[in-house]
Amino acid sequence: MARSIKKGPFVDDHLMKKVLKAKESGDKKPIKTWSRRSTIVPEMIGLTINVHNGRQFVPVYITENHVGFKLGEFAPTRTFKGHKGSVQKKIGK
C-alpha cells in the first residue's frame, strides 16, 4: 500500500537537518546516514549521501530522477554471485 499523500514523504529529522545545513553552506562533503527508510526529496538534489548497506557506506549522488524513491533502494544489501553453473559432462564414444 502506498503512503497517503496528505501525510507527505517520510524523512528522518536528523537527516533533513544535515541536508538543509549542507544546502545553506554550499558544502559538497558527503552526508553519512544509516537512514535507508528516508524518502528522497527535492531539497537533496545535487548532494552526495553515503547510505549504509549493513557493511559499508555506498555513495549515492542525488539527481532529479531519484526524487520519490527511498535511499535504501540505491544501496543493495545483498551481493548476488550467480547461480551454480551446471557442469557439462563429456560423452565419449
Curated annotation (Swiss-Prot):
One of its GO terms (biological process) is ribosomal small subunit assembly. One of its GO terms (molecular function) is structural constituent of ribosome. Disulfide bonds: none annotated. Keywords: Ribonucleoprotein, Ribosomal protein, RNA-binding, rRNA-binding. The keyword Ribosomal protein applies. InterPro entries: Ribosomal_uS19, Ribosomal_uS19_bac-type, Ribosomal_uS19_CS, Ribosomal_uS19_SF. GO terms for cellular component: cytoplasm; small ribosomal subunit. SUPFAM superfamilies: Ribosomal protein S19. It comes from the Bacteria. Coiled coil: none annotated. Belongs to the universal ribosomal protein uS19 family. Protein S19 forms a complex with S13 that binds strongly to the 16S ribosomal RNA. NCBIfam families: rpsS_bact. This is Small ribosomal subunit protein uS19. It comes from Nitratiruptor sp. (strain SB155-2).
